[in-house]
Amino acid sequence: MQRALNSITRFALIPVGIWGMVACGYHFQTAGVIPAGLEPIFIEVFENRTNQAGLETTVTNAVVFEFVKRNEAALARNAADASVVMKGVIRSVELQTISTRGRDVAGERQVTMRIDVQLVAPDGKVKWAAKNLSGQEAYPVSNDKFLNDDRQRVALGTVSTRIAERVYDRLIDNF
């Protein structure tokens, strides 16, 4: 009897769990449909206008990975084979202390990155653009400068991933 009751309870909870996910707006990422005429896309290395060396590689890799993960067929291997080229500019990286550990000693910092992205056709016309996309991530600060630099680099990687997701979502949602 107890075993039957446990099975009934388990099966009753499945629809409740599904309903809870749907009701709260949770949804899985989908590949989505990239508008006609914009495939395949070649992703150029982003321009880095910040003082963060190597950030252009981190951001570009995050965007490429997002496209590979969700719709690898949308990518061209080189610019000559592409319908459009994705060009991006990393506009800024800002650091802000968001908590302290005593007088004038940072306890936690937040890094904010802003980028612009556009899809450009071979004739130079901009087919799509997203300006001022931003993301932020907090990280703990210690007395060790090397550890702080590493934590900042990891935070910038996290922000790059979030912005890459936003770029893809914006592309499939804007049309």
Residue spans of the language-model regions?
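Sec-dependent bacterial lipoprotein signal peptides
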Residues: 1-23
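Residues embedded in well-ordered secondary-structure elements
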Residues: 13, 32, 77, 104-106
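A structural "domain/chain start" motif
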Residues: 22-65, 69-80, 95, 143, ...
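Conserved acidic
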Residues: 51, 55, 107, 151, ...
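Surface-exposed short loop/turn segments
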Residues: 70-74, 81, 85-130, 136-149, ...
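Compositionally biased, intrinsically disordered linkers/stalks adjacent to structured regions
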Residues: 149-175
